[in-house]
């Protein structure tokens, strides 16, 4: 597992990168081992192999406490359907409870049930593995100064399908249908106060930014290379098609259903909005409405790009749907082309950069 040193904190504008000290080089610092502890139960053991204490941000990692995509599960060479949530987290004003403080050579365990976020009712042999990136801060600090990669062992399990099917799905059941705006597919009965108008504005801005980003992807190869790490024509066309799909979904009735508020208890602290890709549903959280409609800061979060980000998580809009492989400009700018094109934040940051001329 290799560590990638960063020059700036998550979300910081490119112009500031040169003024921020480089992060520590923590080569091979985090080790992750997976072990089966039950029919579909997994225990992840995360070890700090370094010689100094690290603060590890839990968001979208193996340590995430929410029903997120912590591992990849395969059966007979095909990926098992993920039924959990893909959240967008607020990356500013991070608090200590979002981190795991891990001393030198120390370990922490995190257990979760695969059957709560995957359809394992078929039963049989599956293979499970995890890989990703953990944003890191210094001991007792919450400012992101680096990232460390991790890649686990590959675990083989023989699952009892009936026992797995009896496990309650974390995000299972049907969301209340409510009253739906036929033009936007917003569940208007889920909206309070001026939330409906704020969401409609965000969708309109998402469409505008997506169309501009699609145009820039074809006309500005230098900017495209900066974010997507290639100017290959097939990748350009894929990105253009995806931006235009987001634009269409933002302006007319599509296959996603958008809720102004949470109906599934997914809006935990730090979550701006989240998507259930297995259902093509998007839910806003209270913190979403505290964001600006459009941010005037390069790579800053706002309602428009959060909506754009979440729409790329929906397979009805983007196939295969985008994941959360890296957050913020500094991490996004270091993703290889194969991952950049599948990373939701790459699309939202590129759209923001085109809009502001970053």
From Swiss-Prot:
Output the Gene3D superfamilies linked to this UniProt entry.
Answer: 2.60.40.2970, Collagenase (Catalytic Domain) (3.40.390.10)
Q: Could you say which residues form the signal peptide?
A: 1-17
Q: Select a single GO molecular function from the record's annotations and give it.
A: metal ion binding
Annotated cofactor note: Binds 1 zinc ion per subunit.
Alphabetical list of SUPFAM superfamilies matching this protein: Metalloproteases ('zincins'), catalytic domain
UniProt catalytic activity: Preferential cleavage of bonds with hydrophobic residues in P1'. Also 3-Asn-|-Gln-4 and 8-Gly-|-Ser-9 bonds in insulin B chain
Its required cofactor(s), as named, are: Zn(2+)
Q: What class of enzyme is it?
A: hydrolase
Provide the Gene Ontology terms for cellular component: extracellular region
Q: What Pfam families does the entry give?
A: Peptidase_M35 (PF02102)
Identify the EC number(s).
3.4.24.39
Alphabetically sorted, this entry's keywords are: Cleavage on pair of basic residues, Disulfide bond, Hydrolase, Metal-binding, Metalloprotease, Protease, Secreted, Signal, Virulence, Zinc, Zymogen
This chain's function reads:
Secreted metalloproteinase that allows assimilation of proteinaceous substrates. Shows high activities on basic nuclear substrates such as histone and protamine. May be involved in virulence.
Q: What's this protein's name?
A: Neutral protease 2 homolog MGYG_02351
């Amino acid at each position: 597992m290799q560590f990638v040193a960063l020059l700036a904190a998550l979300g910081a504008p490119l112009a500031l990168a040169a003024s921020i000290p480089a992060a520590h080089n923590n080569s091979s610092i985090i080790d992750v081992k997976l072990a089966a502890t039950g029919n579909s139960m997994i225990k992840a053991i995360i070890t700090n192999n370094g010689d100094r204490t690290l603060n590890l941000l839990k968001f979208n990692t193996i340590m995430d406490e929410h029903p997120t995509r912590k591992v990849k599960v395969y059966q007979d060479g095909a990926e098992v359907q993920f039924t959990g949530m893909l959240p967008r987290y607020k990356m500013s004003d991070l608090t200590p409870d979002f981190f795991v403080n891990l001393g030198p050579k120390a370990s922490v365990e995190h257990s979760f049930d695969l059957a709560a976020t995957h359809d394992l009712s078929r039963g049989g042999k599956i293979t499970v593995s995890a890989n990703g990136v953990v944003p890191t801060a210094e001991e007792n600090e919450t400012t992101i100064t680096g990232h460390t990669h991790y890649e686990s062992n590959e675990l083989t399990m023989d699952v009892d399908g009936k026992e797995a099917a009896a496990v309650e799905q974390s995000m299972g059941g049907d969301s209340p249908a409510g009253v739906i705006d036929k033009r936007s597919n917003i569940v208007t009965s889920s909206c309070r106060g001026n939330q409906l108008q704020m969401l409609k504005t965000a969708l309109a801005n998402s469409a505008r930014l997506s169309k501009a980003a699609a145009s820039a992807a074809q006309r500005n190869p230098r900017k495209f290379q900066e974010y997507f790490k290639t100017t290959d024509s097939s990748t350009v066309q894929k990105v253009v098609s995806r931006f235009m799909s987001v634009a269409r979904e933002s302006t007319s009735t599509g296959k996603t259903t958008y809720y102004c508020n949470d109906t599934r208890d997914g809006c935990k602290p730090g979550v701006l909005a989240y998507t259930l890709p297995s259902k093509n549903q998007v839910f806003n959280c209270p913190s979403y409405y505290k964001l600006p409609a459009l941010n005037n800061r390069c790579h800053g979060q706002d309602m428009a790009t959060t909506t754009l980000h979440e729409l790329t998580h929906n397979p009805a809009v983007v196939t295969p749907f985008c994941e959360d492989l890296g957050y913020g400009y500094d991490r996004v700018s270091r993703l290889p082309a194969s991952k950049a094109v599948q990373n939701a934040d790459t699309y939202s940051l590129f759209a923001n950069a085109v809009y502001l001329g970053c």
